[in-house]
Design a protein with these regions (language model features):
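Feature captures the catalytic ectodomains and active-site-proximal regions of enzymes
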Residues: 1-504
């Protein structure tokens, strides 16, 4: 009989020196302090080359959970696309070419959508610019850009600079125009807050929104009104740039979770999230990555198959698993943890705890749904039904993104209280080992030494604590978590898992 393990992922919990802006060290965390002092602890790299991203690139939840579940470094789509742009292979992508040629032959417009940022989490500015070059080279006459502003993975007022750069690029190619600009809060929702998506959709499809002649000035006016990039109200710069039936659309976001809802709204005949004032059903709609495996839309960069993930091994061995998170991170402990596979594994139970929808931002409810997630974990441990439990607490990341220090402190303390309850139950079960970690940093830097608010992830390492007294842990990277879990459970490690157990 194998041993049991419970993996607790504290999303956005990085390790950094104590500073006034470090909510992790400023918060009161008696339970984590005890666990980290009583049990072996190490630090894990969660960014850059160690998670399959470009050197120096901050990690993110999708990448982190993919690496954790796979037990190997999984090279990501961001560096792949960037490399193909450099080699010229990007410009030969047949899926992109088909959409471009459809627009050219039909005389219709080509629409390029994407998060306008160099944050590299959901998209990259460089990729959008390369697409504009490609459309120009292939002779498309009408190209319209619908851009979402970031403000989370990059500074909250960096958007005006990105829009200015896009405006300059459009002038350079000559056939492209900025059609709409909006904060990601609207068109890049992932929690089925359809009122938000509807506002974004109506700007892109119906030309409804704040009318402006100059995109940069519209963003700067938003700043003057106290509204930063993420929340910029949908702005219509070029009303004739609305998407119409028969047009071609290329969505340049490569991360699925915040690209799905707008894609559904634009493409599904039976879509019921909101009543569409205008249906467009584009002639060609290209997803840069796979946004939803149930969609039949063309994908420029199809997913690579990751075999023998930690979840696969549990199913293969006939072991029971329990995955739990609130809505904001549910896809991460299921789809991403399973290597981009939506299908539930044999013996894998899942629990989705709804994230609170009644507040527009999580600084207003920093506890989120953590207590309910904690209840489910404690119940699962107490039941002794499961061999592996995987849980995510979203607070330090989601509240960290708001940039509000007081709320981040409450978020960290909420997670600490939950870990106290989970550890108390786990310590009643000697055959179960608790493994505590994070997928990337965030709340460890809420503002810098100059007091400038930081809403982005960090490149700091993350903790790794294993409740095995007397053992020793080496430092490593996220890819080493699954092999360590297998070692704890006394199960063999498959050849595909190139990470290593950090237990010594």
């Amino acid at each position: 009989m194998s041993k049991k393990a419970a993996l607790i992922i504290m999303d956005g919990f990085g390790i950094a020196p104590p500073t006034a802006g470090n909510a992790i060290t400023q918060a009161d965390t008696p339970h984590l302090d005890r666990l980290f002092s009583e049990y072996p602890c190490a630090q894990l790299s969660a960014s850059g080359l160690d998670v399959g991203l470009p050197d120096g690139q901050m990690g993110n939840s999708e990448v982190g959970h993919t690496n954790i579940g796979a037990g190997r470094v999984v090279f990501q789509i961001l560096p792949k696309i960037s490399q193909e742009i450099r080699t010229g292979k990007f410009f030969e992508n047949k899926v992109y070419i088909k959409a471009i040629e459809d627009a050219k032959v039909s005389g219709k417009a080509l629409h390029v959508m994407g998060l306008l940022s160099d944050g590299g989490v959901h998209s990259h500015l460089e990729h959008i610019f390369a697409m504009l070059d490609m459309a120009k080279a292939r002779g498309v006459e009408k190209v319209f850009v619908h851009c979402f502003l970031d403000g989370r993975d990059v500074p909250p007022t960096s958007g005006a600079g990105f829009v200015a750069a896009l405006q300059k690029k459009c002038e350079e190619v000559g056939n492209a125009h900025i059609a709409t600009v909006q904060g990601r809060f609207w068109g890049m929702d992932r929690d089925k807050r359809w009122d938000r998506v509807e506002r974004g959709y109506n700007a892109i499809v119906c030309g409804e929104g704040v009318l402006a002649e100059d995109a940069v000035k519209a963003v700067e006016d938003s700043y003057a009104a106290g509204v930063t990039d993420e929340f910029v109200e949908p702005v219509v710069v070029c009303p004739e740039g609305a998407i119409n039936a028969g047009d071609s659309v290329i969505f340049m976001n490569f991360r699925p979770d915040r690209a799905r809802e707008m894609t559904w709204a634009l493409n599904l005949p039976d879509f019921d999230g909101f009543e569409r004032k205008k249906e467009v059903f584009p002639l060609s709609y290209v997803c840069t990555a796979q946004y939803d495996e149930t969609l039949t839309l063309p994908i420029a960069y199809p997913p690579e198959v990751i075999t023998n993930t930690l979840g696969d091994l549990m199913s293969e061995k006939g072991l029971r698993q329990f995955r739990v998170a609130e809505t904001e991170k549910y896809a991460h402990v299921t789809f991403f943890f399973n290597g981009g596979v939506e299908k539930q594994g044999e013996g894998e139970d899942r629990c989705l705890v709804p994230s609170p929808k009644e507040f527009p931002t999580y600084d207003l409810i920093p506890q989120m749904s953590a207590e309910k997630v904690c209840d489910k974990v404690v119940e699962a441990i107490a039941s002794e039904k499961y061999d592996l439990i995987v849980c995510n607490f979203a607070n330090c990341d989601m509240v960290g993104h708001t940039g509000v220090m007081e709320a981040a402190l409450k978020a960290v303390e909420t997670v600490d209280a939950c870990l106290g309850r989970i550890a108390a139950e786990a310590e009643k079960h000697p055959d179960l080992t608790l493994l505590i970690t994070a997928d990337h940093g965030n709340a460890d830097c809420m503002f810098d030494e100059n007091g400038k608010v930081n809403t982005a992830h960090t490149t700091n390492p993350v903790p790794f604590c294993v409740t095995k007294k007397g053992a020793r842990l080496e430092n490593g990277r996220l890819a080493d978590i699954a092999p360590t879990i297998l070692a704890v459970m006394e199960l063999p490690q498959p050849a595909e898992m190139t990470g290593r157990s950090l237990l010594k």
